Amino acid sequence: MGRLRLRPAALWLVVLCAPLAARAEVALSSFLQQNTAVNTVTANPGGRHYKWLEERAQLKLDATGGAWRLLAKGDFAYDHLGRGEQSELREGYVDYAADNWDLRAGRQIITWGHGDLVFVNDVFPKDHEALFAGRPLEYLKRGIDAVKLGAYPELASFELVAAPRFRESRVPDSRRFHVFDPMPAVTNRETLKPGQGDVGLRMYRDIAGYDAALYLYRGFQRTPSMRPDSMTAPTKVTLFHPKLSVYGASVSGRAGDGVLSLEGAYYDSRQDREGTDFAVPNSQTRLLAGYQFQPGEDLSLSFQYYTEYMHDYGAYRAGLPAGFPVDKRWSHTVTVRVTQLFLHQTLRFSAFILRNTSTSDYFVNPELRYSFTDKVWGAIGVNLFGGKPWGQFGQLSPDDNVYLQVRYEF
């Protein structure tokens, strides 16, 4: 998030819709928030002992008039760890609703699929740094500047998302997190972003009481890959986003005393379908099964099993440079989430546990949140990481932290 992220298109959107806001029912709301995260193991690579230290304010405008709606959320923050003053348009879009179709244009947050911190068909950008630094979970998702068209014939419902400009996921900052780098001595880095946008389609309907959906996506990997200019004596590393298509499906519904969800997708690595380019992720099949139920009053439990299968594994092994960590053909992950409410539902304890049985990676996040009033709440939690030094969570094992969130809403 830069110093100012209110792009001209966003300003044009506000100006264009000002007459709507003037004639519509308008709701204004806001919050003030303090967010602190402190290391418990060692200092950051940049030498500081805080993962996060900021004050933040959000202003929200929601205007509705007839078939039209305007929503805008703007964040303003001050970061004490070197980023200083920041502002960002979190969401800003216009809705139009007709009888059997609707349209949304502008910056919007889109979520597909059923995974809990495990993503199969949810191909839209994330903020992984926000999750690992103990920010509120709503900041895990990043908005995209897109047009979303919904159509609702009798056969099924359709949702088409077209973004003219690609937006990447935010990865942890190497000055705040101990991120694995196979070429740390090469400091000359160049980042290449796709010069075109991406498009996705979701088709969904009810089948015998179950919510079923098909997904299509054509775009790019949200997290970058790295390619050195030479394998023998590299002087420059280029970060780029490989081309990607995703074909997926999901189904969810009642099963026994809970809700069962099944999800799968094929990740087509269009830039390297043979699997011989070590810098481009191989094509994958991803499968997810989840079950959520309530064994007692104010208590909920959920379990997930997630697996990834790497295609063209022999070609991947043959093309992998010497000294690089080796991924396995199969990856297996299990997760558990428990949530318990106390004190007339004003106190909430939650814990999320993720364990990759193939790489020994783990991520543990217990949190205690208390609502002091209807407008003020606070939360304290812990992020624990572990596993192999090159694993998704193992690389972050020095980054264990305790975080505190306090928010006043008005």
Q: What name fits each language-model region?
A:
Residues 396-410:
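Outer-membrane beta-barrel "beta-signal"
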Residues 252-274, 278-354:
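Detector for outer-membrane/organellar transmembrane beta-barrel domains
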Residues 57-63, 91-96, 147-151, 201-205, ...:
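Residues on the lipid-exposed face of transmembrane beta-strands in outer-membrane beta-barrel proteins
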Residues 26, 67-71, 101-103, 155-158, ...:
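Repeated loop/turn-to-beta-strand initiation elements of outer-membrane beta-barrel proteins
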Residues 24-41, 63, 68-72, 349:
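Transmembrane beta-strand segments of Gram-negative outer membrane beta-barrel proteins
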Residues 62-178, 205-208, 385-387:
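Outer membrane beta-barrel
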